[in-house]
Swiss-Prot record:
Function recorded in the entry: Cell wall formation. Catalyzes the addition of glutamate to the nucleotide precursor UDP-N-acetylmuramoyl-L-alanine (UMA).
Catalytic activity field: UDP-N-acetyl-alpha-D-muramoyl-L-alanine + D-glutamate + ATP = UDP-N-acetyl-alpha-D-muramoyl-L-alanyl-D-glutamate + ADP + phosphate + H(+)
Sorted UniProt keywords: ATP-binding, Cell cycle, Cell division, Cell shape, Cell wall biogenesis/degradation, Cytoplasm, Ligase, Nucleotide-binding, Peptidoglycan synthesis
GO biological process: cell division; cell wall organization; peptidoglycan biosynthetic process; regulation of cell shape
Domain of life: Bacteria
Transmembrane segments: none
GO function term, MF aspect, one: ATP binding
Annotated family: Belongs to the MurCDEF family.
Lineage: Bacteria, Bacillati, Actinomycetota, Actinomycetes, Mycobacteriales
Root EC class: ligase
Protein name: UDP-N-acetylmuramoylalanine--D-glutamate ligase
Source organism of the structure: Mycobacterium avium (strain 104)
SUPFAM superfamilies reported in the protein's UniProt record: MurCD N-terminal domain, MurD-like peptide ligases, catalytic domain, MurD-like peptide ligases, peptide-binding domain
Gene transcribed to yield this protein: murD
Primary localization class, coarse: cytoplasm
Length: 489
């Protein structure tokens, strides 16, 4: 046994391990455990999923049965969808059986040298901007000639890339993944921002922030100072090197903006990195994402030139402030990835005049303060989805002169055919068995187009999750783009 191997306890060859969840994460965990020599059993609530694994020779059990016999297992490795209050994790805790997430398993296997020399992990988290920042970081590392892999909550699970040659991992992690990764100690970790999100999973904002803060327990902690909740995490970070980034002029130990240039005063005395106007992501959010990515790149000695090169050639991902079309002087922007109020606010504030398409599942988050801050930018609003009433109430309080249209369908589960309407117009969608999301978005785009004038932006930035009417944020964005193309023909 090597000196590093005890970090893997209670995992050992032949150990009975329960894998919770049969999705993409579960498949990656099964492959890693089999490679290690453990004896995994997979549990899932979906009988069809279990049958698929049985056909592949995997031992399976229902989630409820697994909870009843939890003491048979030395370890549970869970998919991030299992909240700590779910019956299975609670049963494991009561029986004294450790619960890891797939990221925790990946971290321990990598640190133990199971895949060769351990990689240096650079981890990005936050309520918003994770994917763009992590992609920027990976581009910077690649431009510098460093062997980097993009993984985590973007691209492939970390476990799926560890057998590939690399020096560095650019890892996007969600609060769910971080909750189940208590021993993670990255080379550098960044918390971009903290806003109300996933409170239905974490229970409280404090627990959500504590999960995010786990990325700050490694060597270098990077935090967005313009976000008060994120900034508060820096003083308690365990990392010996603490770095902040801001939109204003940086102090020593920070990255920021001076004279239209991104400047590093944390890893150099005073190093100019790149011009602000070379950042392709619109608005302050693009500058902040670039600063965070640059901070993590600088913490592993990436020079200024490849950082600038990566940003100049960077392309924004799908459904992230993506311009779909410009027609009759109106710009149509798909920011379907804005799945919480904080993200929607950043999106709306990037444009001077906005017809806002919003609504869906708010997941317990409040939109009131966000609507108040961005009310001056709104020239119209089109509301969709189950929780559109909460958005309408906020608009009635803080933007009473903004015209509002509700897109209503009675066929979607949990939605009312005749909702409470706050002095607004109502567009009723007749859903006759086709694609509900397409019908809703077609009506929403038509209503937004009627409200917009030349120079305005019709912006899909829902502030909410999509699963009440769509398969996911990408499906919602695709429906928006298709509706726009059909409308401007």
């Amino acid at each position: 046994m090597s000196a590093a191997e005890p970090a893997l306890a209670p995992l050992s060859p032949g150990a009975p391990v329960l894998v919770a969840g049969g999705g993409i994460t579960g498949r990656a965990v099964l492959a890693a455990l089999r490679r290690f020599g453990a004896a995994p059993t997979l549990c899932d609530d979906d009988p069809a999923t279990l049958r698929g694994y049985v056909d592949s020779g995997v031992d399976t059990v229902s989630t409820s049965a697994a909870a009843e016999r939890i003491s048979r297992y030395a370890l549970v490795v869970t998919s991030p969808g299992f909240a700590p209050t779910a019956p299975l994790p609670l049963a494991a805790a009561a029986a004294g059986v450790p619960v890891w997430g797939d990221v925790e398993l990946a971290w321990r296997l990598d640190a133990a040298g199971h895949y060769g020399p351990p990689r240096r992990w650079l981890v990005v988290t936050g309520t918003n901007g994770k994917t763009t920042t992590t992609s920027m970081l990976h581009a910077m590392l690649t431009a510098a000639g460093r062997r980097s892999l993009l993984c985590g909550n973007i691209g492939s699970p970390v476990l799926d890339v560890l057998d590939q040659p690399a020096e560095l991992l650019a890892v996007e992690l969600s609060s769910f993944q971080l909750h189940w990764a208590p021993s993670l100690r990255p080379e550098g970790g960044a918390v971009l921002n903290i806003a109300e999100d996933h409170l239905d999973w974490h229970g409280t904002l404090a627990d959500y922030a504590a999960a995010k803060a786990r990325v700050l327990d490694g060597r270098v902690a990077v935090v967005g100072l313009d976000d008060s909740r994120a900034a508060a995490l820096l003083s308690t970070a365990r990392a010996p090197v603490r770095v902040g980034f801001r939109l204003g002029e940086p102090a020593a130990g920070e990255l920021g903006v001076r004279g239209g240039q991104l400047v590093d005063r944390a890893f150099a005395d005073d190093l100019t990195l790149l011009p602000v106007d070379s950042i392709p992501v619109p608005g302050p959010v693009g500058v902040l994402d670039a600063l965070a990515a640059a901070a993590l790149a600088r913490c592993v000695d990436v020079p200024a030139s490849p950082i600038a090169e990566a940003i100049v050639s960077f392309r924004v991902g799908r459904h992230r402030a993506e311009v779909v079309a410009v027609a009759d002087g109106i710009t149509y922007v798909d920011d379907s990835k804005a799945t919480n109020p904080h993200a929607a606010e950043a999106s709306v504030l990037a444009y001077p005049r906005v017809v806002w398409i919003a609504g869906g599942l708010l997941k317990g988050a409040s939109v009131d303060a966000v609507v108040a801050r961005m009310a001056s930018r709104l020239v119209g609003a089109v509301l969709i989805g189950r929780d559109r009433r909460e958005v309408a109430e906020a608009l009635s309080r803080h933007a009473p002169d903004v015209p509002v249209v509700h897109v209503v369908t009675g066929e979607d589960a949990g939605m009312d055919a005749t909702p409470v309407v706050f002095g607004a117009n109502v567009t009723k969608v007749k859903h006759l068995g086709g694609d509900l999301g397409a019908a809703v978005m077609s009506a929403a785009v038509a209503a937004a187009r009627d409200l917009a004038k030349p120079g305005d932006t019709v912006l899909l930035a829902p502030a909410a999750a999509s699963f009440d009417q769509f398969a996911g944020y990408a499906d919602r964005g695709d429906a928006f783009a298709a509706a726009v193309r059909a409308a401007i023909r």
